[in-house]
Design a protein with these regions (language model features):
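Catalytic alpha/beta core domains of metabolic enzymes, predominantly
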Residues: 139-247
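Active-site beta->alpha loop and helix N-cap motifs at the rims of alpha/beta catalytic domains
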Residues: 3-142
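A general structural signal for well-ordered alpha-helical segments in protein cores
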Residues: 29, 65, 90, 122, ...
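Basic/polar N-terminal segments that are highly enriched at the extreme N-terminus
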Residues: 1-5, 299-302
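C-terminal alpha-helical cap/extension of soluble enzyme domains
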Residues: 11-16, 39-40, 200-204, 211-302
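Short helix-capping segments at alpha-helix termini
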Residues: 70-76, 100-101, 129-131, 154-158, ...
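Short secondary-structure transition/capping segments
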Residues: 56-59, 116-121, 146-148, 201, ...
Length: 302
C-alpha cells in the first residue's frame, strides 16, 4: 500500500473551508491541498485540530478525504485524521482510509477517555488499516507517557510515527526520542512551528503546523537539513511574529489573502478572535519580514 517509505519534514494541516450554508467548500479544500503541493510542503494532514475534526460529520469527512486525495494525486503523502468521539468512530475512519488509499492515519484518543483506551484504540486501528500509523500524543486527549509509547511501539509494529505535542513540546520530544528514536521513522512536533529549532535539536525530524505559512517552515526545515542551523534560526526568528498571531480566523484570512480560500467562513462564531482592522494590519506588517521567503502565493494586504 505504501507509496512513501519515510514521512518527514513539514506536513501542512489543512483548515476546513466552508460555504455560506456551512457545508464544506470542496473547491476550496482542493485549493488548499493544491497550495501545499505547489508551495513545496512535504505532506498534508486533514482533518485534525486545525481542520476542526470535531465539527465534521462522518459522510462529509469521507467526501473531503476523497477530494483531497483526488487533488493531490500521489504528489505528496496524505495523512487522514481519524480522531473521533468514540472508538467505533475512529475505526470507521481508519477503515475508510484503508479503502480510499490514504498514505497514513493519525488519531488522538476520544475526549474524556484514558490511556488504557488510547492504547486499545491504536491496537485496533492496526487491525483495520495496513499502512503506517501516527500516534498523536496531546495533553487534553488521554496523553501517554514516554514509557507507554515505547511499549505501544513494541506491541504495534505499524506505528511508525509519533506526533508529540505534550507541552512543553521540546522536553517531551526528547523523552520520546530517547525511548523510541531508533524504533520509529520520525517524531513530529507541533505548536504551529513556534519551537521548531529546539524540537529539531531534541530529536524531531518533522513538524505539523497549520499550512498557511508552512511553505516558510518548509524552507527553515530544509535549510536545517543542510547543516546551516544559524541560517535556519534567522529565518525562524523572522517568521515567529507571524505564527504568534495564529488563530483559526487568522489561518483562513491568510489563506484568503494568499489567493487560496474564497472566504473566511467558519462553523463557529469567531467571537473575541474575530479579526479587526488592527489585527489585519499587524498580520500585514509581520508578513513583511518573510515576504521574500514565500514559495509563491504572495500575501495581498488590504
Amino acid at each position: 500500500m505504501a507509496r512513501f517509505n519515510h514521512l518527514k519534514g513539514v506536513f501542512g494541516l489543512l483548515p476546513t473551508p466552508y460555504q455560506a450554508d456551512y457545508e464544506i467548500h470542496i473547491p476550496d479544500l482542493k485549493a488548499v491541498a493544491e497550495f501545499c503541493c505547489s508551495s513545496g510542503q512535504h505532506g498534508i494532514v486533514w482533518p485534525v485540530m486545525v481542520g476542526e475534526f470535531y465539527f465534521l460529520g462522518e459522510e462529509e469527512r469521507l467526501r473531503g478525504l476523497d477530494a483531497v486525495l483526488e487533488q493531490v494525486n500521489g504528489r505528496l503523502p496524505v495523512v487522514f485524521g481519524c480522531s473521533g468521539v468514540s472508538l467505533s468512530q475512529v475505526l470507521l475512519f481508519a477503515r475508510a482510509a484503508q479503502t480510499a488509499g490514504a498514505d497514513s492515519i493519525i488519531a488522538m484518543a476520544p475526549a474524556r477517555t484514558n490511556a488504557a483506551l488510547a492504547i486499545e484504540m491504536y491496537k485496533r486501528m492496526a487491525d483495520v488499516y495496513d499502512g503506517p500509523i501516527m500516534v498523536q500524543n496531546a495533553d487534553a486527549y488521554a496523553p501517554l507517557t514516554g514509557e507507554q509509547i515505547a511499549q505501544l511501539v513494541e506491541d504495534v509494529p505499524s506505528i511508525e510515527y509519533i506526533k508529540e505535542e505534550r507541552q512543553p513540546g521540546p522536553k517531551h520530544i526528547a523523552e520520546v526520542y530517547d525511548l523510541v528514536g531508533d524504533k520509529v521513522k520520525t517524531i513530529f512536533g507541533g505548536a504551529a512551528g513556534k519551537f521548531l529549532p529546539d524540537e529539531l535539536l531534541r530529536g524531531a525530524d518533522g513538524c505539523m503546523p497549520a499550512c498557511e505559512v508552512a511553505d516558510v517552515l518548509t524552507k527553515i526545515m530544509e535549510i536545517w537539513w543542510t547543516g546551516d542551523q544559524e541560517a535556519a534560526r534567522e529565518l525562524h526568528r523572522r517568521l515567529l511574529p507571524l505564527i504568534l498571531l495564529e488563530t483559526h480566523p487568522m489561518m483562513r484570512y491568510v489563506l484568503q489573502q494568499r489567493g487560496v480560500f474564497s472566504n473566511t467562513i467558519g462553523r463557529t462564531p469567531d467571537g473575541a478572535q474575530a479579526l479587526n482592522a488592527g489585527d489585519k494590519a499587524e498580520i500585514a506588517r509581520a508578513f513583511k519580514y518573510i515576504e521574500g521567503d514565500l514559495n509563491g502565493y504572495p500575501f495581498k494586504a488590504e
